[in-house]
Amino acid sequence: MERRDFKEQLKKTAHLARLHLTPEEEELFAKQLQNILDYFKKLQELDTSNVEPMAHVLPLYNIWREDEVRESISQEEALKNAPEIEDLGFKIPRIMKREE
């Protein structure tokens, strides 16, 4: 992906996530993400023909636990940084049209 296209994709993603990025942040994040993608390209060059396929990196079995009630943050605390609140919950932009 070309750098210009990559920056446009980053802007779209930031907009969807309702992040307001400065041009400097856009440049910084685009560079960081490009470095990550470049690293993935390096990983694809590794010879893994002798590596057994696995579902998990660590051999963990029966990791599920019983649900338990624990202290958590209050609803007020959870919503304090929300850009918009409606009916004591997060208000998000509509992404689907209603059938009339």
From Swiss-Prot:
Protein name: Aspartyl/glutamyl-tRNA(Asn/Gln) amidotransferase subunit C
Subunit structure: Heterotrimer of A, B and C subunits.
PANTHER family referenced in this protein's UniProt entry, alphabetically: GLUTAMYL-TRNA(GLN) AMIDOTRANSFERASE SUBUNIT C, MITOCHONDRIAL
Reaction it catalyzes: L-glutamyl-tRNA(Gln) + L-glutamine + ATP + H2O = L-glutaminyl-tRNA(Gln) + L-glutamate + ADP + phosphate + H(+); L-aspartyl-tRNA(Asn) + L-glutamine + ATP + H2O = L-asparaginyl-tRNA(Asn) + L-glutamate + ADP + phosphate + 2 H(+)
UniProt keyword annotations, A-Z: ATP-binding, Ligase, Nucleotide-binding, Protein biosynthesis
Cited Gene3D superfamilies: Glu-tRNAGln amidotransferase C subunit, N-terminal domain
EC number annotated for this UniProt entry: 6.3.5.-
Presence of keyword Protein transport: no
GO molecular function: asparaginyl-tRNA synthase (glutamine-hydrolyzing) activity; ATP binding; glutaminyl-tRNA synthase (glutamine-hydrolyzing) activity
Organism this protein belongs to: Dictyoglomus thermophilum (strain ATCC 35947 / DSM 3960 / H-6-12)
Family: Belongs to the GatC family.
Pfam family, one: GatC
Any one Gene Ontology BP term: regulation of translational fidelity
Free-text function comment from the UniProt entry: Allows the formation of correctly charged Asn-tRNA(Asn) or Gln-tRNA(Gln) through the transamidation of misacylated Asp-tRNA(Asn) or Glu-tRNA(Gln) in organisms which lack either or both of asparaginyl-tRNA or glutaminyl-tRNA synthetases. The reaction takes place in the presence of glutamine and ATP through an activated phospho-Asp-tRNA(Asn) or phospho-Glu-tRNA(Gln).
